[in-house]
Amino acid sequence: MKNTMLIPLVTVTWFLFGWWIYWAFPTGPGLAPSIMNESAALITDESAFSAKWYVATSDLMAVNLGDHISGVFWAAFLLFSWTAASIVSGAVIERITVFAFGILAIAIGSVFWTIDAAWGWHFDGWMLKLLGYHDAYASGVIHAVAGGFALGILAVLGPRIGKFSSSGEPRNIGPRNPWLVTIGLFLIYTGFWGFYAACNIPIFDLGPEYGMEGVTYFTATNIYVTPTTLSGITFNFLMSLSGGLLAGYVISKGDPFWTYSSGLAGVICASAGNDLYHPIQSMIIGMIGVVVAYKLH
């Protein structure tokens, strides 16, 4: 994969294949009770868990006033599969064929990240039950898993051609078009912000808990169905973004590629607990994560 236009093409279209594998297992692959208790493949009747929602004629695909959230999760989890593959694509650039990448993209997008998501997000997941794992906005469930998957591939592929000099000193390979990189990263900022908001659904009634009997007082919830607020996660998103940008600018001595990339890195570093942190904590975590990433590169 060397052509500039080939990367976005395969990134967008790979899930035309992975899609069918992902939705063919409505109850998961059945590797452990923490995923689901049973495994069911290619079942489209009501005998399988939520399988009836996966067909094109279901109410989920149209306006259904009795269901406010299923469509959001349906699209969000597809987006997660897509994101996992896109992270891998950036890591293996110039060293892999499209066919090989397609196989790996289907593997990470259809199988591996879903297992990790079951462990860390499902109420029966062992990471959640035994370790108290908390990852409200996919910091580890998506980005860490995809990064680890990419690292395993790179251990086989090796570095990019020209990355190291004959003496073993690493060379900096900058972006081909800094302007497009800048635009793309700012679009990702906006999309990530929207993802944060979409992950917080106003379905949790705190009226009785606050002693307001007969009064409905809705607040937002995350994937763990714990209360949070759109205001709080917005502040934390912006502060982790700001911390990443600031740290990237300072440590890279004003390099625009690293500055803007560090903004995204700051958000990802703090996303696991951005529904819990104080905004200053989010900023500090974002800064520390960027410093570590820059030193490791």
Where are these regions (language model features)?
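Hydrophobic alpha-helical transmembrane bundles of multi-pass membrane proteins
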Residues: 1-297
